[in-house]
Amino acid sequence: MSSDLAGLDSLGAEISRRAAAAGVLAIWRCQERSVRRVLVRNGRAESTSAVSLGGHGIQVVNAEGYGALASRDDLRAEPALALLDRVIDVAARGRTLGLERVALPELRPEHSHLPAADPDSFVSIDLAQATRRLIELESEIRGRVSGVTVQVSYRAELDSWRIFRSDGSDVWFAMPRCTIGMRATSAGYGSRHGVSAVVFDSSPRLFDDEASVALYLKRSEAASRLARELPDAAPHPSGSSPLVIDYALAKGLAHEAFGHASEADSFRSSVLASEGRFRVGEEVGPEHVSIIDEPVEGDHAWQPFSANGLARERAVLVDHGKLSDGLSDPWSAVSGGVRLTAAARAESFHHAPQPRMTNIRIEVDDPLPAPGEFEGYGPEQVRDLLAGAGVFRRHPKIAYLSGYSGGQVNPATGDFVFHCKAIYDLSPDGVEFFKPAIFSGSMFGALQSIREAFGPLKLDAVGYCGKWGQSVPSSGGSHYFLVLDEHPTVRLGGR
């Protein structure tokens, strides 16, 4: 699959030579992507698809700070060189066109080749075989839990990039992303609830991997049982209360609240910035809490290099309670008052890169133990963890928010609204089950109220993140569970 990217040495060198002769910085982004999908419902394939795309985008910035970007859906040499000439011409007319000027950054040349280890395994996927396997998995799930409708899905994607810069940089990397997912919906009349589960891997054969399938079935069974039980649950009372959230909801808090507000291209309106500059050193949380974003190899959102051809760096957004790094690219770091963390990502070669997250987590110093795997913890086991740590001596009743079902944050104010999958009131007397409710409030109040963490870091809460018309993979998490003390700015909805 990556043969076209492998043969770009001469063309990349010529583009760099011409850009240098014209006195511009040029970034040439070449991409090939293969995506295979299967969706199964009621024992048959509802849809299958196989999509491949390839092409390139050229971005230039001249000495005056005017830039332009253009793209083509092929990798042919003559059209690529002609496109370069046109982009250079547009940038040269930047003042007349009213383009915004940017500072021409000084970048460190990069040279690294990390192509896909087995690209043929992606383009040779047998969709008929994948469909048969998904039908088997759907049947297994339906056999374990009755009373729900089940939809199962498979996606295998290989996203390969080669990025040249006119300073001689040449980086080539491939990002394999494969998932099997399911959604269970309560059947019958009245209120209906849907609950999802997903497992990811870098191999397109994950539906035949014993460990992946076992985890998938365990998560799918739990999701199906929850979907079946939710219609009969009562609504949770509204108000502020102490909370326990799991790693998936913690990822949502880190990503939606602090992550987006830390993206340097948003500092003009971010609650974490003043007059366009990140408020480095300002206290926003307790000393034992940090928020970190970095690429994790093998992860769903792994990206080792930015879309500008720079090695992506670990960014500590909140370092033991204080603002530290922003998520920046060469054009936003200096103006935003943060160091360059090479956080730029692009959905495709057509798009202009933007500072984005990869794998983001909330990390707490000295977490308490939570033995075993996360999937072994139901509400009763979470209650036992809290009891063993003496949390009930501080809070006689705690609301456990299980799972994450999306949400949004206003990065200008820090106000958030999140959705969980279910709520359980935990107390020394037992467990009470409720429908999910809105979890809302101030991101500062939520972070300040984090008191304890249980278990190791778990970073496999995956999804896709949209920003300015671009969608890129995201992932992250936290420790198995976080305990949040009651805070007046954080509340649960309900009736």
For each of these PLM feature ranges, what is it?
Residues M1-L5, S10-G12, R17, L25-R37, ...:
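Acidic low-complexity segments
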Residues R268, G276-R495:
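Dual-mode signal for accessory low-complexity, basic/Gly-rich regions
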